[in-house]
Swiss-Prot record:
GO molecular function, one term: ATP hydrolysis activity
Keyword NADP: no
Role noted for this protein: The RuvA-RuvB-RuvC complex processes Holliday junction (HJ) DNA during genetic recombination and DNA repair, while the RuvA-RuvB complex plays an important role in the rescue of blocked DNA replication forks via replication fork reversal (RFR). RuvA specifically binds to HJ cruciform DNA, conferring on it an open structure. The RuvB hexamer acts as an ATP-dependent pump, pulling dsDNA into and through the RuvAB complex. RuvB forms 2 homohexamers on either side of HJ DNA bound by 1 or 2 RuvA tetramers; 4 subunits per hexamer contact DNA at a time.
Protein name listed in UniProt: Holliday junction branch migration complex subunit RuvB
Domain statement: Has 3 domains, the large (RuvB-L) and small ATPase (RuvB-S) domains and the C-terminal head (RuvB-H) domain. The head domain binds DNA, while the ATPase domains jointly bind ATP, ADP or are empty depending on the state of the subunit in the translocation cycle. During a single DNA translocation step the structure of each domain remains the same, but their relative positions change.
SUPFAM superfamilies linked: P-loop containing nucleoside triphosphate hydrolases, Winged helix' DNA-binding domain
Family matches, as HAMAP family: DNA_HJ_migration_RuvB (MF_00016)
């Protein structure tokens, strides 16, 4: 989105900074209390039995800690960690090369697992159930199937689009776990920890200001923290205060709800061009010059969570809160009757 500040998009941080700011254990991990409590039980049980932990699926919006939790699982299980992604595994041989090199009880993390090709997914089924690979050698009448035994391992899948997973693949995960947006209090702790690790002095009000505008997402909180620290060093005395945080984030185009220029463009489009909706997702994506997936995965989850938009069978509609946020008056037409009376 051309008018959107990339600071607010939950793409990954540079690897060195990303790794430095990540918690290294479940004890350090802030938020996702229910998921952490359950994972602690499953990890301890696997360690006591000396077996591979059951296959685990993390799903939810991007930037909530799916990769971090997978790394923590491997660390607390005391086993190796291998990481890949669905689009990278283009053919069965790619998957076979990884699986045959796993040590006993290792954790294999597949990001964007909903993007696995069907042919690779078919090879994965026996690997998950029987720890074996069934590969076809040769072609035509001379083709034969060879079974390769694998070491027991734990597959951790991550997806932002649970609905795109096939039912057979989804059913093979014994531990499905949904990650939720973080509270402001949780993000404040995360930002304060990040500031300490960066060697930056901070005021509670300053870290809270960043947390308030981080869209419930730790990855965005970390990115905003780095930008605010830049302003604190160049235009302040190096201390992260509420005033410098507010000034920096305002200049970055982040409002008090955490919406950026792209979010406000989305809301304004529906308000000004379509009278508040309903309007179809394909129309919205075309008008914004964005891919439909980008709109559904990146922009809409937080707007829905904040109660700014509503998904209906006829399309997207603005909620009353969105009209107030835009400083506009909601129309009283029949299309809005169900939302505004």
């Amino acid at each position: 989105m051309t008018s959107s500040d990339p600071t607010l998009r939950p793409e990954r941080l540079p690897e060195d900074m990303d790794r430095a700011l990540r918690p290294q254990s479940l004890e350090e991990f802030v938020g996702q209390a229910e998921a952490r409590a359950n994972l602690r039980v499953f990890i301890e049980s696997a360690r006591m039995r000396g077996e591979a932990m059951d296959h685990t699926l993390f799903h939810g919006p991007p930037g909530l800690g799916k990769t971090t939790l997978a790394q923590i699982m491997a660390r607390e299980l005391g086993v190796g960690f291998r990481m890949t992604s669905g689009p990278v595994l283009a053919k069965p041989g790619d998957l076979a090369a990884i699986l045959t090199n796993l040590e006993p009880r290792d954790v294999l993390f597949i990001d964007e697992i909903h993007r696995l090709s069907p042919v690779v997914e078919e090879v994965l089924y026996p690997a998950l159930e029987d720890f074996a690979l069934d590969l076809v050698i040769g072609e035509g009448p001379a083709a034969r199937t060879v079974r390769i035994e694998l070491q027991p391992f734990t597959l951790v899948g991550a997806t932002t689009r649970l609905g795109l997973l096939t039912t057979p693949l989804r059913d093979r995960f014994g531990i499905p776990t949904r990650l939720q947006f973080y509270t402001e209090a949780e993000l404040t702790l995360i930002v304060a920890r990040g500031a300490r690790m960066m060697g930056v002095d901070s005021d509670p009000e300053g870290t809270q200001e960043i947390a308030r505008r981080a869209r419930g997402t730790p990855r965005i909180a970390g990115r905003l923290l780095r930008r605010v620290v830049d302003f604190a060093l160049v235009e302040g005395d190096g201390r992260l205060t509420q005033a410098i945080a507010d000034r920096a984030l305002t200049r970055l185009g982040v409002d008090h709800l955490g919406l950026d220029l792209g979010d406000r463009r989305y809301l304004s489009l529906i308000a000004e061009n379509y009278g508040g909706g309903p309007v179809g997702i394909e129309t919205i994506a075309a008008a914004l010059s964005e891919a439909r997936d980008a709109v559904e995965e990146v922009i809409e989850p937080y707007l829905l969570q904040q109660g700014l938009i509503q998904r209906t069978p006829r399309g997207r509609m603005l909620a009353h809160k969105a009209w107030r946020h835009l400083g506009l008056e909601a129309p009283k037409g029949p299309g809005q009757a169900d939302l505004f009376g």
